[in-house]
Amino acid sequence: MGEVSLIGITAILCQKTDGFWKNIDDSLCRLEVLKSNIDSKFRLVAISTDNRCIFNKWVRTNSEITKCSDLFLEIKQVSSQSSNVEYFGVNFAYKPEVDKFYACFSKCIETLQTQRRQSTLNIQALQINNELQQQLQQQQQLPPIDQLPPPPTSTSTSTISNANISISNSISYDSLHQMASGITLEDLPPPPPSASSLILNNNTPLDLTSLPPIDFSNLPPPPTGLMTSRSSLTEANGLEIKNKLSPLLNGGASGLSSSPPPTTESKNQLNSSSGSNNSSSAPHLTDLFLPTNNNNSSGNQSASNSSPTSQYHQSQPNLQQYGTAPLTASSKLLQQQQQQQQQQQQNIIMTTTTTTTTTINIKTGSSSDSFLKTASGRRSIRVRHSTNQAADQQKKTMGRKDGLAVSLQNVEGLQNIAENLEDETLNLLDLVNEQVVTPEISNNAHLNQSLMKIFEHLQVLFILTGQASTHPGGKLITQVVNKLGRGPQASEFFSGKSVDGGYQWYNLDEVKDSVIGIHNLLALKKNLITAIAHLSTCVRVLGLQASLEIDWMSRNKSSETEKIVVQLACLTRELISSMSRLLAATVTYCYVCSSIAFIRNQQHSASADHNQASIQNRIRSPSTIDTINIWDELKTIKTIPTVPKDGSILKVTLNQLVLMLTSETSYDSKFLKTFITTYQSFASPGVLFTKLIERFYVPEWYSTVPTKISTIQQKVIVVLKYWIENQSSDFDQDVIDQIYFFINNLANSNEGYSELSRLLRGLLDKMIQDREVKFELLFQMPPRISFEEDSILSPIELFSEWSAQSIAQQLTLIDFSIFKDLEARELLNQNFNKPKLKYKSPTIMRMISKSTQFSFWVAYVILMEPKKEKRIKIFEKFCEVGKYLLKMNNFNSLMGLNAGLNLTCVHRLKKTKKKLSSSAISILTELERIFSSKKSFKNYRDHLSTVQLPCIPYLGFNLTDITFIEEGNTDNISSTDPAAANIGPLINFKKRELLYQAWADLSRFQETPYTFQPEEPLNTFLLNFPILDDKELYDLSIALEPK
């Protein structure tokens, strides 16, 4: 069968299976579009460098081609018979070939679709017109088509048969021009959908014979799909339509658009939005079929200097020469668009809006700025500045020797992936925020769609970056690629089950099994909000780090390409892990909110006539002894207990503690502080408030003396005031409603408490206002970071670019921002040591996680450097960071640094440590002395007792002390008094005094903050670290210094 090659390009071919890309063959190939000389059929054939046919597919009529990046095209083909859909990806080695292949393949699709339409119209006409049926019978008497003489072919035509495949490397322009000269206006597709009618310029009929022949390069692009090619219109000497197939504009609409998909209105805006910074002119027929030429002609220069406005609007063919048809609404709209286009100034601001994101492109002269604005008003953390000169500088050619390093030439493709990854990560965070504001337990569609987009971006990224087979961490790349190939698993992202072991702070199964009552659900909801905010920060920072890493690599500033790819794999794995925890927390949060709403609806219907009784029943636990009224117990014990002066154990019930707290004869401020700080180890906030209300209403049998009753009631109000001021986080909405109910009754009474009730209401209103502000701040994005192109740093180069003092300062600021949120209730009942109760100690978990993560990051940065000289410098710089951390009294990060340097994988690097400077060795010796475990870390405790504030202690030692207190003292003591046998076990309040003292020793460090100022982007980068596990670090260590 005679075939002619329309175009040949150099690329790597991919195929999408189950939504994920996989290379058809890992080597570069020669991909050609072949056209049959007998009929208008086309097929794609790819021959590898060792002459293997790795791809041979017919081009189907139902085909689409989409730009995913400036060097990656996606081809979608649908079978007309079986409706099977196939996706093929073309990863180009040379940027100039992209637009040419796009135009050629689009023409093939248009030709096939035109043939189908003509065939359909002919069949319909034959069924109606008898004369045409007779003509058809006459035509059927003609000889078969295979007996007709074949058309003339050019000497340069390549012949492909089943036995032998031979593809030409160059095609004769003359022969192709002769073949294209037979195409008439009827071969053109109808106008685009937005130009549904003809626009007439004169009253003379159109003479089709006077039109010049149309070549391939002058045909319009395919219909608008997921990715729309922007076009510009020029008119000279008759009809001339030149389509400029523009690459993606950095920060603008992308081939892998943000999720959810844009609405109809948004798509219309997308079609008119900015599309490219590429100034190259439209490909002509000579450019389309001749070999690649990197020299810019004068014509290209002229096109690049044309008005920028034309690059921002999809072309609409000027059809006024076609006849005399009346103007329609669509035609008037087209004219208005053309007038608006003429009125555009040199400065252009175009906006592309989707459901949740808005990309704003600002063009000034030859440069353009872009930023992302989300539904929540957030702007992207990065601003990119680009110029038209960058596109010319990025046009590189590769020899066969450099073929396997094709990723380094995908400059714009990598930059677009970087932009898309950051945008979609921010979009995912927007969707999570929406779920927090309006939780829906079963609506995960948009979250799943956004997650799939992120996986697609990452998968295309590793297709572009290739492999790192010689780097010791190359196994990690294979692991990450396989994880991306499997795609996001619902059991990992949307079930709420435990992931990543110790880093999991919530568990949906635990919520289902052990949470009883609305109070516990409300407490869990509050903790989950904090966890979701923290995990959102992790996802944002990791997404930014990966994005900047890709962007930095695309500029080819380092010869250690494989090291960067391993870094990307590490960032990718950490990003996937953070997203899984974030989405699991979000699903858990939605479930908790649904359970709270269900319980409240039940209680509302059941307590219509007994509201106050229902509230008291709701906050009680029927399995505890606190159901005994405080006054009934006073009848039994006769007298109120007092705090022992000799330091002996105080053994009392909850009712007795409240009686002591509000005694009309004595007041002990230390006892009040100890009680309010530790009461949650034996009672909930709702139960305590109930006891205070019981105490407030004094029965007549106890006393009728107004002064005595007033003293008791004022003591209750003083306790309530101190509680609200110092432990505001204890109050959930259920308890707040009860307090407001009490305040209203107090204000309406005639007992002279109107001023006190006003004071309590003011405190409660302020507490709620502060809580709302804190909630908004949790999900408020920080100010964006502005990067110039030359100043964008790779996270892997972060440690070497910034000074040791700056790194220590930013670590200290981050640590203190976490430490200051620590609350006493997180230390109670050893919740931080119990897997199913860790969610009750979120700040402790964050502190532990931060210190552990920093330790592994220290080892990671050292072991990622394969050169010993550079590895020694990194080791010494970490020692210098430790020196500044010690000066700043940041023992949390200092302990993490010391632990990282003493991990087995680092400690065994004898050749590296042998070359350390004397100053580095002295710092290591000092750290070893301070954190020596002798005599229960006596050196550290002595040093901590002498430091001046501000200071951040290492939390692990405090938790150890609290664990000793918890395990060395019982919670309750059995009563030996037979008369008190019916009141149950007694609370060991001596244990609570010890816990309060431990908390007081720790909380004093929260009072004095640091005065350092955040430095960006260092502060943002240090919020989260990419790390490897123990085995991976040890494998790197063995590779660097074998046994």
Curated annotation (Swiss-Prot):
Residues covered by the N-terminal Ras-GEF domain: 645-768
Alphabetical list of CDD domains matching this protein: RasGEF (cd00155), REM (cd06224)
UniProtKB keywords: Coiled coil, Guanine-nucleotide releasing factor
InterPro entries: PH-like_dom_sf (IPR011993), Ras-like_GEF (IPR008937), Ras-like_Gua-exchang_fac_N (IPR000651), Ras_G-nucl-exch_fac_CS (IPR019804), Ras_GEF_dom_sf (IPR023578), RASGEF_cat_dom (IPR001895), RASGEF_cat_dom_sf (IPR036964)
A GO molecular function held by the record: guanyl-nucleotide exchange factor activity
Function, as annotated: Promotes the exchange of Ras-bound GDP by GTP.
Name recorded for this polypeptide: Ras guanine nucleotide exchange factor S
